[in-house]
Design a protein with these regions (language model features):
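Active-site-adjacent structural elements that line small-molecule/cofactor binding pockets in enzymes
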Residues: 1-264
Length: 264
């Protein structure tokens, strides 16, 4: 597993203007944040925002104005797009960015969740059970593998192919999906405050180790806290003891440029 503790930044793009996002992207790039993440939502309502710029469209724009920082969705909801459309969108961003995409993927919310309101408003049917949502995510992984394969079927010959395969990281809340992450992808992500964080991350890491992966990404997301910018802090040491090698910090509202501009 990767041992270095990396620090990433996530923004809620629905609460930012394009000018603000441009400024934040440059600050993050110039202050050693490894990846700039955006959300994948269709409605601003579920993120307390007045609107919500589309995820991959925004990532393409961010790719064009940056040169070194990685970019990605945390996480792309597999219920929002046909997997073939997701493959095309992700490959396009990967190529615009010159290979800087990190592809976060998620199974999506229950149809009874408040987060499902945006899909229901558009008439997008959501799988009723967790196992069905997990199966949909695995089907998406299958389609990505098929379309991006160097030996892909001739029918995909002129579909966008990424310049290199983007690392895939699954956002999880359960042991079951942690096993999928460890077995089939390049990383796992979980909310730092999840009550079973350590156990779920251990399952993902053990599964990845059994699959022969030595560079598995073990990440958590948390609200922005300057203390977590210091790898010697108690919080960072606790996470590192659980195998975490990446912290993704989400700032509420419009990111504060002064708080972000901390050389590390």
């Amino acid at each position: 597993m990767i041992n270095e503790l990396g620090i990433d930044l996530q923004v809620n793009q629905g609460q930012c203007s394009w000018a603000q996002l441009t400024e934040i992207a440059h600050i993050a790039e110039n202050n050693n944040y490894q990846t700039l993440w955006v959300a994948d939502h269709l409605s601003g309502q579920v993120m307390n925002a007045p609107s919500m710029p589309e995820c991959f469209t925004l990532l393409g724009a961010l790719a064009a104005i940056t040169s070194t920082i990685n970019i990605g969705p945390l996480v792309a909801n597999v219920g929002n797009r046909h997997p073939g459309v997701l493959a095309s969108a992700a490959a396009t961003v990967q190529n615009i960015s010159g290979g800087r995409l990190k592809l976060g993927l998620g199974a999506g919310a229950s149809p009874t969740s408040t987060f499902a309101a945006e899909q229901l408003a558009l008439g997008i049917a959501l799988p009723a059970t967790m196992s069905e949502r997990h199966a949909k995510l695995e089907h998406t992984l299958d389609v990505l593998d098929e379309i991006w394969s160097p030996t892909r079927d001739e029918k995909f010959a002129t579909f966008e192919m990424p310049c290199k395969l983007p690392p895939r990281i699954i956002g999880v809340n359960s042991m079951a999906l942690a096993k999928v992450a460890g077995a089939r992808t390049d990383g796992v992500n979980i909310r730092s405050s999840h009550p079973q964080r350590a156990e779920i991350l251990r399952v993902a890491q053990d599964t990845a180790t059994a699959a022969g992966k030595s560079d598995f990404i073990v990440s958590v997301w948390d609200w922005f806290d300057e203390a977590l910018l210091d790898p010697t802090s108690a919080g960072c040491k606790e996470l590192a003891s659980e195998g975490v090698n990446k912290i993704i910090l989400l700032m509420r509202g419009v990111p504060d440029a002064k708080r972000l501009a901390i050389k590390r």
